[in-house]
């Protein structure tokens, strides 16, 4: 729900104990607080191909003060207002979005998020595909293709908190990984499925 960077957020955990944040949250100066990043993100979300729908949330998820979020919100709100006035996007509460979703989809539909340009100019592009059964991520970098994520969604898999309450200040919810480039990578080697061609050599 953060409005995560579809190209760079995923690898932002590699080699560290905690995953950093590259998202639309206005407190993050290199993303939600950066005009260049916000304009790129909005183009990716609102102009590039998707399936059933594309969406993002705006605002600040955690309790930061106005001083931390002022710059980012002053960048984002006028850009959203301009797209809203042109009829390019809807701006609504999460409650209304949930109602719209229920009215239009009896089950979770396939969706896709695409980022076909790279604001860092490192020749990366990505497609995230999601369905009620699985999610997968394709990453193109230069002339290579890597499947860096496939997670299966299985309602039969009970969470650790289904039969008993959590007793710590941290909860971990998981899905079934087929490929987990975030958790399985090191700083030296990014994990993923790569398409290879065998030559006579």
What are these regions (language model features)?
Residues 138-201:
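Acidic-aromatic substrate-binding/catalytic surfaces of carbohydrate-active enzymes
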Residues 60-64, 136, 143-144:
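Short, solvent-exposed loop/turn segments at secondary-structure junctions
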Residues 41-44, 70, 132, 144, ...:
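Short, isolated positions within intrinsically disordered regulatory regions of eukaryotic proteins
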């Amino acid at each position: 729900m953060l409005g995560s960077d579809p190209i760079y957020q995923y690898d932002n955990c590699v080699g560290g104990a905690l995953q950093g944040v590259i998202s639309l949250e206005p407190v993050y100066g290199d993303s939600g607080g950066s005009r260049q990043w916000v304009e790129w993100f909005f183009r990716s979300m609102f102009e590039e191909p998707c399936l059933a729908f594309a969406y993002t949330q705006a605002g600040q998820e955690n309790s930061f003060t106005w001083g931390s979020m002022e710059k980012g919100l002053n960048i984002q709100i006028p850009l959203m207002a301009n797209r809203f006035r042109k009829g390019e996007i809807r701006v609504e509460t999460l409650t209304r979005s949930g109602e719209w979703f229920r009215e239009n989809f009896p089950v979770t539909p396939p969706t896709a998020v695409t980022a076909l340009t790279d604001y860092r100019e490192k020749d990366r592009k990505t497609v995230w595909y999601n369905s009620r059964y699985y999610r997968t991520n394709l990453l193109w970098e230069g002339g290579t293709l890597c499947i860096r994520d496939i997670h299966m969604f299985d309602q039969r898999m009970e969470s650790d908190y289904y039969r008993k309450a959590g007793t710590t200040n941290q909860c971990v919810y998981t899905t079934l990984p087929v490929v987990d480039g975030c958790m399985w990578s090191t700083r030296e080697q990014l994990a993923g499925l790569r398409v290879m061609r065998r030559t006579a050599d």
